[in-house]
C-alpha cells in the first residue's frame, strides 16, 4: 500500500507529502514547486536523474537503486512485514535520522535532535506537545 497527501489552494495543488523531507533534501529552487504540484506517478520521469545525481554526491552505495526506493515519494506499508522505516513508521522512529543514514550510506547517522516527549501507553499514544 502506498499513500501520500496533497494540499490545494484555489483548485491548484500547491504541496504534497509522502516520506518526510524528500522534497526538502532533493529538490532546489523551482524544482520544489514542480515537485509539490506533481503526481507521484511521474516522480521517476520528472526527478529520477536529479535524485540519482544527489545520491551519488552523498556517497550512496547504489544511487540508482536507492532512488527507485525513494521514488515515487509515497509512504509505503506492507502488512506482511513489520512496521518501521521504510515500511510505515513507529512512534519512536526518528525518520530524519533514518533517512540521513540511508542516503549518505552511513556518513551521517543523525541530526542531533532527539525526542523530547514520553509516549503514552494508551490512545492517543503521543506525549504532551511542546
Where are these predicted regions, by residue range?
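Surface-exposed extracytoplasmic segments
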Residues: 1-130
Amino acid at each position: 500500500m502506498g499513500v501520500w497527501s496533497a494540499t490545494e489552494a484555489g483548485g491548484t495543488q500547491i504541496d504534497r507529502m509522502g516520506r518526510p523531507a524528500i522534497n526538502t533534501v532533493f529538490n532546489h529552487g523551482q524544482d520544489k514547486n514542480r515537485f509539490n504540484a506533481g503526481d507521484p506517478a511521474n516522480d521517476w520521469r520528472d526527478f529520477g536523474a536529479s535524485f540519482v545525481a544527489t545520491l551519488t554526491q552523498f556517497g550512496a552505495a547504489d544511487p540508482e537503486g536507492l532512488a527507485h526506493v525513494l521514488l515515487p515519494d509515497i509512504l509505503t506499508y506492507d502488512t506482511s512485514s513489520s512496521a518501521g522505516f521504510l515500511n510505515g513508521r513507529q512512534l519512536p522512529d526518528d525518520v530524519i535520522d533514518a533517512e540521513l543514514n540511508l542516503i549518505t550510506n552511513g556518513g551521517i547517522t543523525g541530526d542531533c535532535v532527539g525526542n523530547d516527549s514520553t509516549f503514552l501507553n494508551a490512545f492517543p499514544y503521543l506525549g504532551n506537545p511542546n
